[in-house]
């Protein structure tokens, strides 16, 4: 134990030494002049968005030009090495932006053609707007040198949501002197209040890919927190009004499933189809209505396959467009709104002693309809209201008497979530989130909470957290608290301490997500980082953390520490490592409701290392190797991923992940006498994914993707747990033979 702690400590100390000389002070604030650019009104013909920049307005001698960009990377604070000039014009309908990106080596301009909203190894420019000028929210618009568009929303000053898709125009073109980008951003893409003359927050940035150089017009060092808080000012916008808009997005999906032959499906094949529509309508300049009928589940089917042997529910990311857009408003420390609950797989089962086998069971609950209203009102108040109705779902099954029957496995349900958030102080907010689930055969489930995120005036320190409650039956009310105090900025030193409390009655999983209740945890982390080139390093991050947790009975169920380091090298490769220690003695969930289980061996250790090559090359790869002890056994895992781009419009990706577990003691089942049955598990698991993409045009692509998972389980030494880390081996192994095998 002491030897391993010493090794880990020496490794972390060596990482700090390799990070370069320690600064004498951790200065976080600099005096800065806020830059300003004036937009020029188009009084004649508006620009044609083609990247040529030959429209009369772009040669107007009265244009106010934004120039003199500053490096954010690699040489922070230094002047740009390639000149960039930006101009802004506008008319009654839209904002127009032009970039002149001069390059001394135009033959090295990178132009990878990919699908919209996908990052690539390309030169690019970005326009970031804060129309409310609240220093908290906004939109960002990217154009690559290949003309590929990306966009997203910005919230809470620094957080981004790439799921937002605006209807705007952009084009890029290569010129002998470099390349140009041209924007048309209609006002209906933006949310702002009416005013005689507007002042918006704005920033422009550029990335020169072959130099890995990122420059900002309105510069702020990486040591200072904030994104929108450091924007410059866009002035001169007079006589413009927010525009209403209507978008209708119909869809049709067809698919086929091929599997094993069953009694219900004699040939193992099934053809499926689905249609629906999404609608977006601007109710006002700052409120938008989104509605959907039978939302697209096509993207949900791309969830990575998982074999979950733990006591915790698998969390899946949201992929449906209706639920993705604007989801940032519902993000709070406690996940009271987990949108994958809406339309989830049916959770009920057939309660019929005569049931023989299933003929048909829906994979998901049908959403009859859903609608939401989102926006930001005057005074800095953001609101979001969502309501969805799901259909009753039934399973068709065959009885032992040869009769076909149906049973309800998911009652009809109504889901509601209401969010309100108020800007306060300097780049801070307080808010509330409330949810309600009404479903036949269940008592209405109500949850709610108040959250906050408060910064000091200089943006260095912040205090954030949330208090929540839940009531899912007539009697028990649960509560929870999350609090975090952090040093959010600083050139070298950052860190935080945090506290989490979830009482035994806290139940938020009807519409939210939590891995457990009956839990109290305290912990913290510390990080030392560098961003100056030193020796072979460009950037380094060195972090250590420790957290301890107990249930309300006082049992020690979570005590873990970690040290990790990340090094970005001057050749743009990245390497790093992590070391973890787990010292808790008990688990109160492993027996699935049958008391405490003592870990066979404690403490346990794990560690790993990774390597990522320069993704700008045609061929790149990343790999990681991890190993450790766990549950009285050991394990190791390895991942290898490869990307190959033979041409700018052609890309192949492949990855393989292999995981091997030896002699790990795991819960298997509970017997009729409520005793937990355990066994030693040997597990081999391999997962694969492959994607091929061809871009025929920047707005037309063809993609083929596949993924798979194969797991082999071998349970041995089956035994009954009697407590105090002792077992009775009086189990007939043949009774559990079906648990072994290969699963895919």
What are these regions (language model features)?
Residues 1-5:
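N-terminal secretory signal peptides that target proteins for export/translocation
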Residues 8-19:
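Bacterial N-terminal signal peptides
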Residues 24-422, 431-432, 442:
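Structural preference for beta-rich elements and adjacent junctions enriched in aromatics
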Residues 93-95, 137, 179, 196-200, ...:
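Outer-envelope beta-barrel architecture signal
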Residues 186-194, 226-241, 283-287, 326-330, ...:
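Outer-membrane beta-barrel proteins
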Residues 221-241, 393-458, 487, 573-618, ...:
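Outer-membrane beta-barrel transmembrane domain signature of Gram-negative proteins
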Residues 242-290, 415-471, 532-535, 540-546, ...:
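Surface-exposed extracellular loop regions of Gram-negative outer-membrane beta-barrel proteins
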Residues 366, 458, 465-744:
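Exposed, low-structure sequence patches enriched in small/polar residues
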């Amino acid at each position: 134990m002491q030897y391993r702690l010493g090794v880990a400590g020496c490794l972390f100390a060596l990482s700090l030494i390799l990070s370069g000389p320690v600064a004498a002070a951790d200065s976080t604030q600099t005096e800065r002049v806020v830059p300003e650019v004036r937009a020029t009104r188009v009084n004649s013909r508006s620009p044609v968005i083609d990247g040529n920049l030959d429209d009369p307005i772009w040669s107007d001698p009265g244009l106010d030009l934004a120039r003199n960009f500053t490096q954010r990377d690699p040489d922070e604070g230094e002047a740009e090495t390639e000149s960039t000039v930006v101009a802004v014009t506008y008319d009654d309908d839209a904002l127009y932006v032009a970039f002149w990106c001069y390059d001394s080596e135009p033959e090295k301009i990178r132009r990878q053609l990919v699908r919209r909203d996908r990052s690539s190894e390309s030169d690019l420019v970005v326009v970031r707007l804060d129309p409310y000028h609240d220093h908290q929210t906004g939109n960002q618009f990217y154009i690559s040198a290949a003309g590929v568009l990306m966009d997203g929303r910005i919230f809470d000053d620094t957080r981004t949501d790439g799921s937002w898709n605006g209807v705007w125009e952009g084009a890029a073109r290569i010129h002998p002197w470099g390349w140009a980008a041209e924007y048309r951003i209609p006002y209906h893409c933006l949310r702002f209040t009416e005013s005689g003359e507007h002042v918006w927050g704005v920033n422009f940035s550029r990335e020169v890919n072959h130099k890995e150089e990122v420059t900002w017009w309105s510069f702020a060092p990486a040591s200072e927190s904030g994104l929108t808080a450091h924007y410059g000012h866009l002035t001169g916008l007079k006589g413009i009004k927010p525009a209403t808009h209507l978008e209708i997005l119909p869809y049709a999906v067809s698919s086929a499933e091929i599997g094993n032959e069953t009694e219900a499906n004699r040939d193992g094949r099934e053809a499926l189809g689905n249609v629906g529509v999404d609608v977006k309508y601007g109710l006002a300049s700052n409120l938008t209505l989104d509605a959907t009928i039978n939302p697209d589940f096509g993207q949900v089917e791309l969830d990575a396959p998982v074999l979950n042997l733990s006591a915790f529910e698998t969390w899946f990311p949201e992929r449906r467009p209706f639920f993705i857009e604007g989801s940032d408003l519902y993000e709070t420390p406690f996940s009271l709104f987990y949108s994958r609950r809406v339309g989830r797989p049916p959770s009920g089962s057939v309660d019929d002693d005569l049931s023989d086998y299933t003929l048909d069971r829906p994979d998901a609950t049908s959403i009859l309809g859903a609608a939401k209203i989102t926006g930001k009102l005057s005074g800095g108040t953001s609101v979001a209201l969502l309501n969805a109705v799901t259909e009753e779902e039934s399973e068709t099954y065959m009885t032992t008497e040869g009769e076909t029957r149906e049973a309800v496995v998911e009652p009809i349900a109504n889901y509601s979530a209401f969010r309100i958030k108020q800007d306060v102080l300097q780049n801070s907010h307080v808010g509330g989130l409330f949810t309600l689930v009404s479903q036949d055969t269940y008592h209405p489930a109500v949850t709610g909470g108040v959250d906050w995120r408060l910064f000091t005036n200089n943006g260095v320190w912040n205090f954030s957290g949330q208090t929540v409650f839940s009531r899912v039956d007539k009697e028990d009310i649960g509560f929870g608290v999350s609090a975090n105090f952090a040093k959010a900025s600083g050139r070298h030193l950052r860190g935080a301490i945090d506290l989490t409390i979830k009482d035994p009655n806290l139940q938020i999983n009807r519409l939210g997500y939590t891995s457990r209740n009956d839990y109290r945890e305290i912990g913290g982390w510390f990080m030392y980082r560098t961003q100056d080139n030193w020796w072979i390093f460009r950037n380094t991050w060195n972090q250590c953390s420790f957290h301890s947790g107990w249930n309300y009975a006082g049992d020690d169920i979570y005590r873990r520490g970690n040290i990790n380091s990340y090094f970005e090298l001057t050749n743009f490769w990245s390497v790093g490592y992590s070391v973890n220690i787990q010292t808790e003695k008990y688990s109160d969930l492993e027996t699935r409701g049958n008391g405490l289980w003592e870990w066979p061996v404690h403490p346990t250790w794990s560690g790993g290392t990774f390597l990522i090559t320069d993704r700008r090359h045609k061929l790149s790869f990343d790999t990681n190797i991890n190993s450790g002890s766990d549950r009285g056994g050991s394990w190791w895992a390895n991942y290898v991923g490869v990307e190959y781009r033979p041409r700018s419009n052609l890309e192949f990706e492949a990855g393989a992940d292999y995981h091997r577990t030896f002699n790990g003691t795991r819960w298997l089942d509970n017997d009729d006498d409520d005793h937990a049955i355990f066994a030693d598990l040997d597990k081999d698991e391999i997962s694969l994914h492959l994607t091929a993409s061809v871009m025929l045009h920047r707005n037309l692509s063809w993609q083929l993707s596949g993924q798979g998972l194969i797991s082999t389980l071998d349970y041995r030494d089956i035994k009954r747990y009697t407590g105090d880390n002792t077992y009775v081996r009086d189990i007939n192994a043949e009774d559990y033979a079906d648990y072994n095998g290969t699963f895919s």
